[in-house]
């Protein structure tokens, strides 16, 4: 497995209970991200307090990237967080996702220049569980953002 300095970008908006579970799972990775950036689309003070609490519990830098709440602008705040990221490899998740302990390791293991990795969630229901594996897309050679 080739090692990359990995930045984990977590987008959130006013749901600190879910973000806490996401942060807990982020800090329990078998391959830790080099940094965590919380892309906050205008949450209230509870989110900032939660992030401050988690900063005190880990040596992994946690960066809170916040923008004023002027409506749904998650794309804008993700872009701002990515601009602040220092990793060569960026993993982006929503703040209501609980990461499998090998989530970062699995991403890094299939990462290559010019490759975009996507996947879906494990959906847990009262009578069923579904899972989709990560997929690597090789066609992102001339991506323009």
Segments predicted by a language model, with ranges:
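The conserved acidic donor/metal-binding loop of glycosyltransferases
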Residues: 94-98
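N-proximal low-complexity "stem/linker" segments adjacent to membrane-targeting elements
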Residues: 1-25
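Short alpha-helix within the catalytic core of nucleotide-sugar-dependent glycosyltransferases
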Residues: 23-24, 48, 87, 101-112
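Single conserved hydrophobic/aromatic residue that forms the stacking wall/gate
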Residues: 133, 140-145
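Conserved donor NDP-sugar-binding/catalytic core segment of glycosyltransferases
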Residues: 102-134
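Acidic donor-binding segment of Leloir-type glycosyltransferases
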Residues: 25-66
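Short aromatic/hydrophobic "clamp" motif used to bind/position activated sugar donors
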Residues: 90
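Glycine-rich, basic loop-to-helix element that forms the pyrophosphate-binding segment
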Residues: 68-85
């Amino acid at each position: 497995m080739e090692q990359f300095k990995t930045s984990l970008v977590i987008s959130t908006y006013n749901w600190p209970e879910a973000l806490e579970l996401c942060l807990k799972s982020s800090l329990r990775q078998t391959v830790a991200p080099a940094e965590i950036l919380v892309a906050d689309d205008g949450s209230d003070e509870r989110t900032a307090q939660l992030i401050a609490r988690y900063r005190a519990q880990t040596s992994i830098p946690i960066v809170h990237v916040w923008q004023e709440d002027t409506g749904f602008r998650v794309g804008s705040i993700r872009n701002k967080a990515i601009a602040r990221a220092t990793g060569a490899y960026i993993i982006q998740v929503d703040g209501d996702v609980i990461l499998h302990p090998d989530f970062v390791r699995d991403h890094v293991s299939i990462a290559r220049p010019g490759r975009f990795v996507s996947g879906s969630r494990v959906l847990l229901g009262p009578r069923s569980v579904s899972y989709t594996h990560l997929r690597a897309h090789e066609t992102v050679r001339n991506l323009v953002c």
